From Swiss-Prot:
Keyword Ribonucleoprotein: yes
Family to which this protein belongs: Belongs to the bacterial ribosomal protein bL28 family.
Keyword match Metal-binding: no
Gene Ontology annotations of biological process type: translation
PANTHER family per the UniProt record, alphabetical: 39S RIBOSOMAL PROTEIN L28, MITOCHONDRIAL (PTHR13528), LARGE RIBOSOMAL SUBUNIT PROTEIN BL28M (PTHR13528:SF2)
Species classification: Bacteria, Pseudomonadati, Pseudomonadota, Gammaproteobacteria, Enterobacterales
GO cellular component: cytosolic large ribosomal subunit
Protein name: Large ribosomal subunit protein bL28
Entries under InterPro entries matching the protein: Ribosomal_bL28 (IPR026569), Ribosomal_bL28/bL31-like_sf (IPR034704), Ribosomal_bL28_bact-type (IPR001383), Ribosomal_bL28_sf (IPR037147)
A GO molecular function held by the record: structural constituent of ribosome
Keywords, in A-Z order: Ribonucleoprotein, Ribosomal protein
NCBIfam families noted in UniProt: L28
Pfam families in UniProt: Ribosomal_L28 (PF00830)
Gene for this chain: rpmB
């Protein structure tokens, strides 16, 4: 599975490592992806998502039903 958040769409960023002498080498900044189950009360079932921790905070704030509805509207 690719490291992309299914809620926010966040993915890795590319940047530089900087040594003491300021030499630049490429590196990846990975996001904190968690595989998490969310309970949907309306359907009485769990849904499994690959979500960043920022996406989890968004779900806690808005509610899983609202977020799922918004994702389905984008498709």
């Amino acid at each position: 599975m690719s490291r992309i958040c299914q809620i926010t769409g966040k993915k890795r960023m590319i940047g530089n490592n900087r040594s003491h002498a300021l030499n630049a080498t490429k590196r990846k900044f990975l996001i904190n992806i968690q595989y998490h189950r969310f309970w949907i009360a309306d359907e009485k079932r769990f849904i499994k998502l690959h979500v960043s921790t920022n996406g989890m905070r968004y779900i806690d704030k808005k509610g899983i039903e609202t977020v799922i509805r918004k994702i389905n509207m984008k498709k």
